[in-house]
Regions:
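Catalytic machinery of carbohydrate-active enzymes
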Residues: 1-322
Length: 322
């Protein structure tokens, strides 16, 4: 068995995108096994993947260069990998990769395409074209290590019994979120004919979604009530998930559930559409010259009006569902 050590420590959605790549890699390379190193709370994302060992770490235990030397020593002693795949390409992971290279491991590192992404999101003279999907960038790391991998880009449903509509109205940044009033209006319409399950996390989100649950029939908030494993099971059973450009889109992709995705300041051209999801299920304002203004939606709107989100009509989302 050829043993590969791979790592990425954040963010949640980015780590979730790795899972289908690893599944297809292991299926196509039966003589390999993977040890995946990440934050402990991401473990359930990798549950049930054959020939994959998840190694959770608390990064506070491995601070600075000396801490990373300690982690390298531990991982090498526990697993003695022949190959090392850096799926993060940040300072911490770069140091780890150098330390493994000094131990004569064959290493490869993610190419994030930073220059192309800057060209896509800059204010003037944008180069607006589809960039390589992030999942293909992850796959390239394994190809650089000398393995073959052809991604299917297909959804694989985890549940045959599908019913209800999921809705995850929140995202990490304002530039990725429908105005909350529009989201509430959408739930009001959807719940007239469908069971609607609401997803979110954090106290503020839990409070908002609990209020909607109390006010509306056919609406259940699951925010703050489930473990990650339980949440994935629920999402797998949905007929469709409505999500912003957020981790929920990637969780649904992981369990083979169709996603109608809403895009504001960010753009799927940057390569972050959920694995196996269709561009036909994207809701966006297409002809805004200012869009995309950032890769992650974390920059304030320089126009000041968030037209990319405020101009979206809920009827456009409903059309995709019907």
């Amino acid at each position: 068995m050829k043993k590969i050590l791979a790592y990425r420590f954040s963010a949640f959605g980015d780590v979730a995108m790795i899972v289908p790549v690893l599944k297809e890699f292991l299926a196509q390379n039966p003589d390999t096994e993977i040890v995946f190193v990440s934050r402990k709370n991401f473990a359930d994302l990798f549950d049930g993947v054959e020939r994959l060992t998840f190694r959770g770490v608390n990064l506070d235990d491995y601070k600075g260069v000396f801490g990373l030397r300690k982690l390298t020593k531990e991982l090498n002693k526990e697993y003695n990998p022949k190959y090392v795949a850096d799926l993060h390409d940040v300072l911490r992971s770069k140091i780890l990769t150098i330390l493994f290279k000094l131990r004569r491991k064959k290493t490869a590192t993610l190419d994030k395409g930073r220059t192309e992404k800057k060209q896509l999101t800059r204010k003037e003279n944008k180069i607006k074209k589809p960039l390589k999907p992030t999942t293909e960038r992850y796959a390239d790391v394994f190809r650089k290590l000398g393995f073959t991998l052809k991604l299917s880009h297909q959804l694989i449903p985890k549940s045959q019994q599908k019913s209800g509509i999921g809705f995850a109205p929140f995202a990490q940044h304002e530039g990725k979120m429908l105005p909350i009033e529009k989201s509430l209006d959408l739930v009001k319409v959807l719940s007239q004919k469908n069971e609607v399950l609401l997803f979110g996390g954090g106290k503020k989100e839990v409070d908002v979604l609990s209020k909607w649950e109390q006010e509306l029939d056919n609406v259940t908030s699951l925010a703050g009530k489930l473990s990650l494993k339980e949440e994935l099971k629920k999402i797998a059973e949905l007929e469709v998930m409505i999500s912003m450009d957020s981790a929920n889109m990637h969780l649904a992709s992981l369990v083979g559930t169709r996603v109608v995705s809403v895009w504001g300041a960010t753009h799927y051209f940057a390569g972050f559409l959920g694995y196996g999801q269709s561009e036909n299920d994207i809701v966006e304002i297409k002809n805004l010259e200012c869009r995309p203004c950032s890769v992650f939606g974390n920059k304030p709107c320089y126009r000041g009006d968030y037209a990319c989100l405020n101009q979206i009509e809920i009827s456009e989302i409903l059309k995709k569902i019907e």
